[in-house]
Structures are given as C-alpha cells and as structure tokens.
C-alpha cells in the first residue's frame, strides 16, 4: 500500500518545495522505505521542453527521455530512485489527455468538466507515478491561492477523502519573514496561507516554515495555535549555505519520525552518515579552482542548475571549492578572451540557436591553444569541433547547419536517424514539431580503448542522457581525425559520434550527452571529477611558471 505525502507552498513562490520534498525523501529512504517523488506543474504547456530557460530554468531529462521540471533533478540527486516521465505532468498534459479521450468517445457523450474529469485524470496520474513505492511525495507546483493550482488542490483533497488520513498527509511550506525595521518575525502571512488552504478543504498536518533564522519557540507556538497544527509538527527551516544540509536539519527536528507516526509506518532510525560526509567535505575544502561556464542563459543560473550542482559534486569528491564564473558568450564576442584569463578551466554547456555562438567558439579556441582544461557538453562539443575544423583542418567557414544551412563544411548537421537503446530506429526530419522530437534520454555509448574517456569512466560502455537534434557529420569526421581529433566515444551502432578529445592537450573533452543529469552529491560523476582535477593541475602548473623567474633570481 502506497502512502501519499502532498507538499504545497504558500505566501510566495521559490521557497524550496522541491528541495524540501527531496530532503524528506532522503530521510524516509534512509529509514528503509522505498520512495518516489512527483511534480505537478500548473502551467498549460504540455512539458517544459520548448520553454525558454529564462522563463523556466533548466529542462531536466529523465532516463526514459522525458523533458521535465528541474525539480526532478533535485529528486534524483537526493534519493536513489530514477525518475521517469510519470513523475512529472502539467495542466497542459492533463487537458490534452482528457480532450483526446473525449474525441475518442471514452466519455460516452458526457459533458466534460473540471470536476470530475480533470480531477479524476490528475488522481489517476498520481497513482500511476506512485505505483510500487512505499511512499510517494507529491509536490504541487505554484502557490496556494493561484487559480492555476486549483484543479490539483481539489484532486489531492479528494484523495484524502478516498484514502483516509492513514494513507495521505499534507505538508504546507510557507514563509515566515523577518521585518528588520520592526525587529520582528511575522507569522501573519503563514496564518493567512493556511486559512486559504483550509478554505478549499485542506488542513495541513505539518507546516515547514522557511525563514532567515531558526524559528523561536514562541513564534512556533503561535503558528501552531492559529493554524490548528500541533506544535511538534511546526518545523523550522532556516536559510543554509548548502542545500545538502537540509536532510540533516529536518531529520534532527524529527520530521521523518513525525511523518511515519502520522502514516502509521513502522520504520528504522534514519542513517544519514552519507549526507554528513557530503556536508563535511563541502565545508572543508583543501583546494580552490575557478571554472568559467560560457553560455547564453547566464542571467538565470537555474538554466544550468544540474551543471552547477555537478561541478559542486566534483568539488566535494576532490576536496575542492569550485568557484563558478558565468560568462555570457556574447560578451566574449564583444570584448575577446580577456574575460577567460583568470580561470583555471573552461566549460561550454548545451544550448540552442545562433546567438552567442562565435563567443563560444572563441572560448574553445582559447582553451585549445593555451592548454586550459576544456569540457564541452552537447553544443559545447559541437562548437569545439567547428573551431577545430576551421583552424586545424583548414575548413574555412565550417559550421553547423543549425547556424548556417549553406556552410561549405557542415561538420555538424541534423541527426535524422539513430538507434535507441531498445534497438528501435528513430527518425526525424526538417519541419517536425520542436516539442519532444529530439534524441532524448539514456543512450548507450561505446568508449575507445586507451582514450581519456575510457580511463575516466573505468569501463568501455556507458549509458548517458541526451537532448539534441544535431550531430557530428560522419562524412567529414575522417578529415578531422587526420588532424588530431580523437573520437573517443560512439553510439552502440557506430553511427553517431558521442565523445571527442585531443591527444596533444592536457584535458580537452567533449560529449554529445549531458553527464550533469546523472551526477549526485554522494557519487559525483567521473567526467566532472576528472575536469576539476585537470583544473587543479592547470592551476598548479600556472603557479609553477609564475614562480620560476623569482626562483632563478634567488639562485
């Protein structure tokens, strides 16, 4: 029997419902329970795949190829469960499925309404996503009071009636602000948020109160009194330097035990030693390395959320504080590579469109010519190949057909056919819809013997997640190999280039996939760990060069 924990948010958005849900999931998992997490998004887009990163932040790709909310990345980083397309759905997806059923005649000519048809579809999708788990944590996107969230809130209200309070539990995340002028913590926004939630039939069982500082006992008691929530169930969650401290903070306040008690679950004590080690390693680095992330969405760092977390994970596993310098590739086009001179390593992430491309190409050239560790992910690999073709293979005006359809040397072109990991041949062509038509999800990759990639992974076959429409053009790859480009990874059917490197460079790696999606704080990822180690080595080498003249003078 699956128990359901519904997490809602009030007062303001961006309080951290996703991280709170994931942290509770980590606690319950450490108590011996099988956990999964779902995210319900109230927007009308079918999925976030075609949404601007400036609007939505990162699109997280699951193993089965779904384009989902970035919160699913938090879920996978905190718990051991692998998310699928069933773990995230939107209002748009729900309505599309209901309308499809209506057109098919499934409702036998009935009038289709929000209640019961939309709410029934939401409940069915929640049950489907939760199937097989001891506990399903269901995060409802948006803020209580938003009109968009009402169908979801109504659906979970109905689930409480249908399943009872031994199988369902409501957690409400809310803000308790500190008003500096008055020198007081204000509980009124939380009181009103709970009042709004109760007005639609939901009484929270547990409150998680977000604040700048830990909540004093007096305010905790006041909140309990006015919201009809027992005082031990009012949890204080203040700001922390690292999100990986949150499972420990919530465990220490007894949240996991409180949940198990309310849901009548017999569970063991939560063993969070792994999280203690992560936090200790993050708080006590022995080294520092500066990494430039050269992209076009740098004004919103959530656009690269999994990427920044993967770099942090690599720092944890190398005892290194990773300083991330986000650099707009258009700024490099305007001001040149001077912006890169103080960094120890350069990373160019994925992206779409021609804006800022030449700045990224300049960054790859700067890294190649100056022996600086370079990590190109997805588009970052493609622009490294474009730069190499132009400079080393004398392919003037080489480009991707994404940016220049008439380029004389299309070293990167639309991928029209590939074999998925199930052995199925998938095809795409010009003019296809943008949504859901990319090469998506986990795909197997065969690594070249004696390559850097093979040494980093420690195995000859890996599965990594993809999200792209364009690939290296096999018709031109032979010429690039003659000039020193190493194809260190290929698709399992040998049709597609998955990884590249340069043999005469200290550390120059490109991959067509997105390794950041599978990095976790407890394990890291071999490519990111190798990249940070290379950055440290480059930093030490630079120090040695700078110290050499003064050493000679001393001699």
UniProtKB/Swiss-Prot annotation:
GO terms for molecular function: ATP binding; CTP synthase activity; glutaminase activity; identical protein binding; metal ion binding. Mg(2+) binds at residues 71, 139. Keywords: ATP-binding, Glutamine amidotransferase, Ligase, Magnesium, Metal-binding, Nucleotide-binding, Pyrimidine biosynthesis. Allosterically activated by GTP, when glutamine is the substrate; GTP has no effect on the reaction when ammonia is the substrate. The allosteric effector GTP functions by stabilizing the protein conformation that binds the tetrahedral intermediate(s) formed during glutamine hydrolysis. Inhibited by the product CTP, via allosteric rather than competitive inhibition. Its EC number is 6.3.4.2. ATP binds at residues 14-19, 71. It comes from the Bacteria. UTP binds at residues 13, 186-191, 222. The active site is at residues 378, 514, 516. Residues 290-541 form the Glutamine amidotransferase type-1 domain. Pfam families: CTP_synth_N, GATase. Pathway: Pyrimidine metabolism; CTP biosynthesis via de novo pathway; CTP from UDP: step 2/2. Catalyzes the ATP-dependent amination of UTP to CTP with either L-glutamine or ammonia as the source of nitrogen. Regulates intracellular CTP levels through interactions with the four ribonucleotide triphosphates. CTPSs have evolved a hybrid strategy for distinguishing between UTP and CTP. The overlapping regions of the product feedback inhibitory and substrate sites recognize a common feature in both compounds, the triphosphate moiety. To differentiate isosteric substrate and product pyrimidine rings, an additional pocket far from the expected kinase/ligase catalytic site, specifically recognizes the cytosine and ribose portions of the product inhibitor. Homotetramer. Belongs to the CTP synthase family. This is CTP synthase. The gene is pyrG.
């Amino acid at each position: 029997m699956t128990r359901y924990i519904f997490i809602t948010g009030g007062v303001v958005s961006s309080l951290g419902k996703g991280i709170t849900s994931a942290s509770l999931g980590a606690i319950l998992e450490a108590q011996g329970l099988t956990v999964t997490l779902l995210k319900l998004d109230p927007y009308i887009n079918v999925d976030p795949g075609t949404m601007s990163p400036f609007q939505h932040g990162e699109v997280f790709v699951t193993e089965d190829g779904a384009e989902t909310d970035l919160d699913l990345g938090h879920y996978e980083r905190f718990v051991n469960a692998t998310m699928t397309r069933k773990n995230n759905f939107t209002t748009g997806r729900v309505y599309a499925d209901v309308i499809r059923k209506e057109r098919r005649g499934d409702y036998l000519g009935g009038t289709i309404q929000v209640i019961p048809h939309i709410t029934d579809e939401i409940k069915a999708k929640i049950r489907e996503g939760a199937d097989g788990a001891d506990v399903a944590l269901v995060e409802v996107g948006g803020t209580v009071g938003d009109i968009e969230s009402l169908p979801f809130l109504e659906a979970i209200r109905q689930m409480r009636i249908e399943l009872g309070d031994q199988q369902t539990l409501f957690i409400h995340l809310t803000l308790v602000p500190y008003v500096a002028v008055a020198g007081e913590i204000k509980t009124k926004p939380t009181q009103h948020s709970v009042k709004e939630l109760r007005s639609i039939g939901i009484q929270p069982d547990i409150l998680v109160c977000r604040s700048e500082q830990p909540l004093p006992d007096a305010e905790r008691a006041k909140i309990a009194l006015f919201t009809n929530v027992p005082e031990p169930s009012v949890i204080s969650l203040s700001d922390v330097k690292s999100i990986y401290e949150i499972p420990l903070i919530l465990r220490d306040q007894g949240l996991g035990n409180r949940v198990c008690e309310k849901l009548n679950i017999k569970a063991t004590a939560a063993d969070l030693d792994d999280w203690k080690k992560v936090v200790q390693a993050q708080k006590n680095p022995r080294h520092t390395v500066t990494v430039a992330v050269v992209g076009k969405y740098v004004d919103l760092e959530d656009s690269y959320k999994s990427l920044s977390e993967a770099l942090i994970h690599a720092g944890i596993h190398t005892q290194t504080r990773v300083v991330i310098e986000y650099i707009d590739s258009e700024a490099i086009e305007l001001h040149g590579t001077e912006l890169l001179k103080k960094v120890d390593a350069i990373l160019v992430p994925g992206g779409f469109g021609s804006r800022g491309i030449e700045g990224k190409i300049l960054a790859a050239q700067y890294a190649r010519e100056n022996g600086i560790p370079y990590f190109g992910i997805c588009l970052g690999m493609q622009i490294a190949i474009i730069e190499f073709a132009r400079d080393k293979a004398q392919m003037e005006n080489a480009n991707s057909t994404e940016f220049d359809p008439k380029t004389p040397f299309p070293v990167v072109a639309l991928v029209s056919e590939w074999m998925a990991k199930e052995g199925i041949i998938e095809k795409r062509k010009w003019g296809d819809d943008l949504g859901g038509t990319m090469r998506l999800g986990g795909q197997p990759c065969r690594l070249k013997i004696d390559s850097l990639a093979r040494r980093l992974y420690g195995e000859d076959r890996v599965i990594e997640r993809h999200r792209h429409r364009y690939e290296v053009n096999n018709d031109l790859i032979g010429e690039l190999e003659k000039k020193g480009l190493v194809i260190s990874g290929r698709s399992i059917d040998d049709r597609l280039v998955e990884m590249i490197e340069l043999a005469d460079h200290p550390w120059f790696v490109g991959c067509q996939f997105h390794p950041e999606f599978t990095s976790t704080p407890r394990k890291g990822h071999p490519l990111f760990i190798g990249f940070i180690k290379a950055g440290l080595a480059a930093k030490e080498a630079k120090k040695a060069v700078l110290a050499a003249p003064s050493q000679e003078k001393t001699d």
